[in-house]
Amino acid sequence: MNKVRNLSVDELKQEQIHLINDIYALAKSKGLSNDDIEPIPDGVNDLEAYVKSNPRVMWVLKEPYDNFKTDGTPCDGGWNLFDAFDKDDAWTNRSWQPIIYILKGIFDKLLSWDDMDWIRDDKTMTELLKRIAYINVSKMPGM
């Protein structure tokens, strides 16, 4: 039986950078990426927190959301999902709100909504988004 070697946090960071570069290269080679649209990479924001986390959580999503042209075709991308978590208004994103509440329940072992603060009252709950893994099935915005 093969023994699995645990990677260090630095090795994981390098692997994540390598995967992100591969995503950009593949999108370009397949004609999915151009001046109007680029991939939005996924992965883990805070690898140290993720490695220490118990349990380790990975959230699988359909696709990243971004802007659309007037004809309805997706555009933009090229931004980092993790940078969005550092914004003061990150908690207002409706896609992330249920994720935040579920993570709060998991990590703080809360079984009732009544035991939780509202995100608007405790914006630090948004920090939970940084310690899990994200996988978008499609890396392209709104496709």
Per-region residue spans from a language model:
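A polyanion-binding, active-site-adjacent surface
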Residues: N2-M143
